[in-house]
Regions:
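Helix-breaking motifs and short loop linkers at transmembrane-helix boundaries and internal kinks
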Residues: 59, 90, 111-117, 145, ...
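Cytoplasmic helix-loop-helix junction between adjacent transmembrane helices
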Residues: 120-158
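Glycine-rich segments within core transmembrane alpha-helices of 12-TM secondary carriers
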Residues: 148-176, 367-379
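Cytosolic juxtamembrane N-terminal segment immediately preceding the first transmembrane helix
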Residues: 1-42, 47
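Conserved MFS/SLC helix-loop-helix module at the cytosolic interface between two early adjacent transmembrane helices
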Residues: 78-115, 297-300
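Central cavity-lining transmembrane alpha-helices of secondary-active solute carriers
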Residues: 70-84, 280-292
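C-terminal transmembrane helical hairpin of 12-TM major facilitator-type secondary transporters
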Residues: 297, 301-350
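Extracytoplasmic gate region of multi-pass secondary transporters
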Residues: 47-49, 235-287
Length: 426
């Protein structure tokens, strides 16, 4: 099909399709990026869902559950180096590497013989997985129409959300699968290898290709060292405010999102089936809300939509971990996880819309590292707070106090909705 042929997005329900006309090239790129987000959402949520089973199989103490995830999150530092190199060698080449690396080490996780091997395999999985996520949002920012970037960011987050839903469905059989939790990682690796094969047809983004022609004669080594200096010199305030917002969001939401499944099983005493009866319907609602919120941000603006979504998630998480055990848990989970995933998607896209093309992969990596690093610190503190309170709920509620910092920071960012990327970068 010709790249300039009209896009149809028939693989999406009518109400979730883009609000403006797009071409086949844009649909193809979005599909190849979005499918990877779908299966990455599955992969990254297995540990949180199957925590009790993995904990029992690898003999992990209760106060080390959250700190273990904080160890995983140090992978973001290596991921930053990989993602930043996309500003030098291109988005396409790196995306081919990251999806294959994530698939390979997801499969390796299933064969972990002990705790150290499990941590090592998951560290490598997340190095490539985090790099993948950083680059996906860069591609979306550079290829989608200005009036559809909010929709694209929201839909990408929704696909990640849908992947988490598939993980919940697979988790339903964790006690009957031949290899238990290990089978969940095997299941997740197969489609990632398939996406890696299909991604051979992913084209380079037009904006990077144009930038590359201008910069082709410059030393790549010199470019690497100067990139961050130029970024800090040209956009210091934007960069600082964006990183404060990312840190506040990551610090507040990381323990809440990760410990939800364990909390339901260990504190509320839900079975895997009951956990799925909360997660799956809530996930479907959250999926629709995430796409709607992305489209809403194109009309009302990124700032007001992001503030509303993040505030909704923070309040819902605080109530979810309050100790109530009733039908309220389902709606609260839906709103909380919607706020977490949609908020992350909107903030990710926000960061890339306010800087020039040559810095986008670097800024995406910086935001991701700050978000993941703040979350890692929060998860470490959660382990200490658990020792003090002897309960995850109160620890999580205390750590949610950073959400207002994120909201205040977003107020001071420029509004990118409906504007061309070149206009915002000026």
């Amino acid at each position: 099909m010709n790249d300039d042929a009209p896009a149809r997005f028939r693989w999406l329900p009518p109400g979730l399709r883009p609000p403006v006309e797009m071409v086949w090239r844009q649909e193809r790129i979005f599909l190849l990026v979005g499918v990877a987000a779908l299966f990455a959402g599955y992969d990254m949520n297995v540990y949180g869902l199957a925590t009790p089973q993995i904990q029992a199989g690898l003999h992990i103490p209760e106060n080390q559950i959250a700190p273990t995830l904080s160890i995983f999150r140090t992978a973001a530092l290596a991921a930053l180096l990989i993602a930043s190199s996309a500003d030098l060698i291109g988005r396409r080449r790196l995306l081919l590497l990251t999806i294959f690396g994530q698939a390979m080490f997801t499969l390796a996780t299933a064969f972990s013989g002990d705790y150290l091997q499990f941590v090592g395999a998951q560290l490598l999985t997340r190095i490539f997985g985090y790099s993948e996520e950083m680059l996906c949002f860069v591609v979306i920012a550079e290829e989608m129409a200005s009036s559809a970037r909010g929709w694209a960011n929201g839909t990408l987050g929704a696909l990640d959300y849908l992947g988490a839903g598939f993980a919940s469905l697979a988790f339903l059989a964790v006690n009957v699968l031949p290899l238990g939790w290990r089978a969940l990682y095997m299941i997740g690796a197969v489609p990632l290898f398939l996406v890696a094969f299909l991604r051979r047809n992913l084209p380079e983004t037009k904006r990077f290709a144009a930038q590359e022609k201008i910069e082709i004669a410059r030393s790549k080594i010199a470019e690497t060292t100067q990139l961050l200096r130029e970024l800090i010199r040209q956009h210091p305030l934007r960069l600082l405010i964006m990183m404060i917002a990312a840190a506040g969001f990551g610090f507040g939401t990381a323990p809440a999102a990760f410990l939800s499944s364990d909390y339901l099983q260990s504190v509320i005493h839900y079975s895997p089936l009951q956990v799925n009866l909360v997660f799956i319907p809530g996930g479907l609602v959250g999926l629709a809300l995430t796409v709607r919120a992305g489209r809403l941000s194109d009309r009302l603006g990124r700032k007001i939509t992001t503030i509303g979504v993040v505030a909704c998630g923070g309040i819902a998480f605080a109530l979810f971990f309050s100790g109530i055990s009733s039908w309220y848990l389902g709606p609260l989970w839906s709103l909380a996880f919607f706020g977490f995933l949609c908020g992350d998607a909107l903030i990710s896209g926000f960061a890339l819309e306010i800087v020039p093309t040559r810095y986008r992969a670097t800024v995406s990596g910086l935001r991701y590292v700050v978000n993941i690093g703040a979350g890692a610190l929060s998860l470490l503190l959660e382990g200490r707070l658990y020792d003090h309170f002897h309960a995850h709920g109160r620890a999580v509620q205390l750590l949610l106090c950073s959400i207002p910092i994120c909201l205040i920071a977003i107020l001071f960012l420029p509004e990118p909705a409906g504007k061309k990327l070149e206009e915002m970068a000026a």
